[in-house]
Amino acid sequence: PDWSRGLGDVYKRQIYYGGYSQIAKVNGDFLIKTPENLTNKQSMMLGTAGFTSLMASFAIQAREALLLGERVKDVLVTGATGGVGSIAVMILNKMGYDVTAVTGKDNQIDFLKSIGAKNVMNRGEFDKEPKLIDKGLWDGVVDTVGGKILANAIVQTKPNGIISVCGNTSSNE
């Protein structure tokens, strides 16, 4: 492709270092031009959160393929009103999973349902000391929060389930 340099031409790719560089030399085949209907900021917000969400969703889909006929159905998404979480809810819903979204924002329940969450749970149900053993509820989990919320999601994941961890905004414990 023919790439120009200058204001308004912002290109992105998530494979190489140098995202904060003012100038970087990279192979032109690795570049994607920012769509004209998005600002540079919007493009990067979607690019970073969207890429992370997509990788987490693909991990769940790949696990399903390994189960040889066992269907991954119930998927939990923590931090569901954040960038990665909300995009994960949308992607997983489009993939056909029953998504349960976890949020601490009660005023966002309608929003989460509008983007594909079948159920919405308050994070208070997860932000507590986990039991050593709990009932298996989830075939898959996308966790963007970490800490006690992740610990509870782990003990509630069914045997042969998959957990994709891509954040620790709550705690690194």
Language-model features and meaning:
Residues K148-E173:
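Glycine-rich phosphate-binding loop and adjacent beta-alpha segment
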Residues G50-F51, G79-S86, G146:
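Glycine-rich NAD(P) Rossmann-fold beta1-alpha1 loop
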Residues V77, N93-N152:
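Adenosine-nucleotide cofactor-binding segment
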Residues G6, N27, I115-G116, P159:
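Short, structured coil segments at secondary-structure junctions
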Residues D9-G79:
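NAD(P)H dinucleotide-binding glycine-rich loop of Rossmann-like/cofactor-binding domains
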Residues G85-K94:
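Surface-exposed amphipathic alpha-helices with a cationic face
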Residues P1-Y11:
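Single conserved hydrophobic/aromatic residue that forms the stacking wall/gate
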